[in-house]
Amino acid sequence: MQSSGQRLRDVEQHQPLLSGGEEEVTAGRVWFIQDSCGMVCAFMTWSLVMYAEFVVNFVMLLPSKNFWYTLINGVAFNFLAVLALTSHLRTMLTDPGAVPKGNATKEYMESLQLKPGEVIYKCPKCCSIKPERAHHCSICKRCIRKMDHHCPWVNNCVGENNQRFFVLFTMYIASISLHALCLSGFHFFTCVKVQWNECSDFSPPVAVMLLIFLCLEALLFLTFTAVMFGTQIHSICNDETEIERLKNEKPTWERRVRWDGMKAVFGGPPSLLWFNPFAGLRLRMLMVRARRSGAEFSV
């Protein structure tokens, strides 16, 4: 009798059959989850980043009389904000690794011509042949390869295909949050010395309220995203998703060593491309494919 690990590996042996044309079509589609909570959280994420942009640029930097201080911090903060929002979009609109839906038909499973003792697993919820390390997401209503968790803030699952962008998103949000806190602290210190005279185009009470809210927002985002970033790096280096860790599943796969895991997620050896959320983005090709095959929505 085969062990559980052997039976699970049998699924991987049939992967060329399980991930045929349907998955290639899905990869060319625009992926978007129509979940009310997720869409609200994604909108809030963008709104809060835009608020930080407004306060940093129009309350702190532009009123400053120090040209180089304004230029250097303005370029750095806005550049990191663009990278953060791009990473958010890539995480949200990238297929996380959805298994083809409804392919576990009796006729199709018979066509696989399994050998005696070979076992494949079927997800009863989405009627899909379930590969090793795939889990069903009740929100996406799909089985996701190497599903780590479903994050409402990006309105998507974090899985095999978009984990890299999620890591970049948490890293860049943590970076702009820390930068905003430092700028706010320096601005408070400077304005108190001059008693807020000529410190801002806004009245002192309004400026103080805007800065306090920014500090609270930045502190909350910094704490949350820094923890998530550390958790994701730990999961990648240990080749274990958050679901597998919580379920305390015994590995039935050969774990990658730390750098192999990082290279598998970020693609290739260490380079600056690891930090580039635009890498691999072919907008023109994506638009052509979207017109040809339509968008894939999960309701």
Curated annotation (Swiss-Prot):
Keywords in alphabetical order: Acyltransferase, Golgi apparatus, Lipoprotein, Membrane, Palmitate, Transferase, Transmembrane, Transmembrane helix
Keyword Transport: no
Family to which the UniProt record says this protein belongs: Belongs to the DHHC palmitoyltransferase family.
GO cellular component, one term: endoplasmic reticulum
Enzyme Commission no: 2.3.1.225, 2.3.1.-
Domain of life: Eukaryota
Catalytic activity: L-cysteinyl-[protein] + hexadecanoyl-CoA = S-hexadecanoyl-L-cysteinyl-[protein] + CoA; L-cysteinyl-[protein] + tetradecanoyl-CoA = S-tetradecanoyl-L-cysteinyl-[protein] + CoA; L-cysteinyl-[protein] + octadecanoyl-CoA = S-octadecanoyl-L-cysteinyl-[protein] + CoA
Processing and modification events after translation: Autopalmitoylated.
Class of enzymatic activity (EC top level): transferase
Organism of origin: Danio rerio (Zebrafish)
Domain notes: The DHHC domain is required for palmitoyltransferase activity.
Primary role: Golgi-localized palmitoyltransferase that catalyzes the addition of palmitate onto various protein substrates and therefore functions in several unrelated biological processes. Has no stringent fatty acid selectivity and in addition to palmitate can also transfer onto target proteins myristate from tetradecanoyl-CoA and stearate from octadecanoyl-CoA.
Entry GO MF terms: protein-cysteine S-myristoyltransferase activity; protein-cysteine S-palmitoyltransferase activity; protein-cysteine S-stearoyltransferase activity; S-acyltransferase activity
GO biological process assignments: peptidyl-L-cysteine S-palmitoylation; protein localization to plasma membrane; protein targeting to membrane; regulation of G protein-coupled receptor signaling pathway; regulation of protein localization to cell-cell junction; regulation of protein localization to plasma membrane
Coarse class of the protein's main subcellular location: Golgi
Domain DHHC per the UniProt entry, residue ranges: 122-171
Membrane-side (Lumenal) residue stretches: 63-66, 186-208
Stretches assigned to the Cytoplasmic side: 1-41, 88-164, 230-299
Subunit structure of this chain's protein: Homooligomers.
Membrane topology recorded in Swiss-Prot or TrEMBL: Multi-pass membrane protein
Transmembrane spans: 42-62, 67-87, 165-185, 209-229
Descriptive protein name: Palmitoyltransferase ZDHHC7
